[in-house]
């Protein structure tokens, strides 16, 4: 199967777009999917990440069908969940939420799960769950206050962005770094490649970092 011409990302997340661009992939269209992200009763963080990724992909595909644009398109969605044990941390929107998350994460390990869901042009459903373990140092009161003042936590799962200032909190990371940012690149590119969409075909010659 030759590489399709369209890659649809079921997200408006700038960091997910940037990660795809890092791998040489430019989404042809962003179709953010508004869904209820509330965990079900006793839902495991793994299950939540998988369920939300699939819901986003299905919602985006439904919209594309209405627009008559689903043909020859890969529809990619992802959802990232941060958890301490089975306790799911919110995507923080207010400072108190972020402070509570960071106090909980301070000096201990947590897990970051990203569910990836991909609908192929032939209608196949592909999915993957990626897990990364992260350990934070003990965050001082002054550091916590400064981080909250930065506003970097807003809208972030677990109340932090590892690619930003919070990277200085990380003592140890086991697994995919890009998973913690919001889209595990190796697994995403592998899912696409399995159905003929090869990222390297878009790599420009003579690129310098």
UniProtKB/Swiss-Prot annotation:
The keyword Cytoplasm applies. Gene3D superfamilies: 3.90.950.10. Pfam families: Maf. GO terms for biological process: nucleotide metabolic process. Its cofactor is a divalent metal cation. The record marks 15, 80, 163 as: Important for substrate specificity. It is found in: Cytoplasm. PANTHER family: BIFUNCTIONAL DTTP/UTP PYROPHOSPHATASE/METHYLTRANSFERASE PROTEIN-RELATED (PTHR43213), BIFUNCTIONAL DTTP_UTP PYROPHOSPHATASE_METHYLTRANSFERASE PROTEIN-RELATED (PTHR43213:SF5). Nucleoside triphosphate pyrophosphatase that hydrolyzes dTTP and UTP. May have a dual role in cell division arrest and in preventing the incorporation of modified nucleotides into cellular nucleic acids. This is dTTP/UTP pyrophosphatase. It comes from Chelativorans sp. (strain BNC1). The lineage of its organism: Bacteria, Pseudomonadati, Pseudomonadota, Alphaproteobacteria, Hyphomicrobiales.
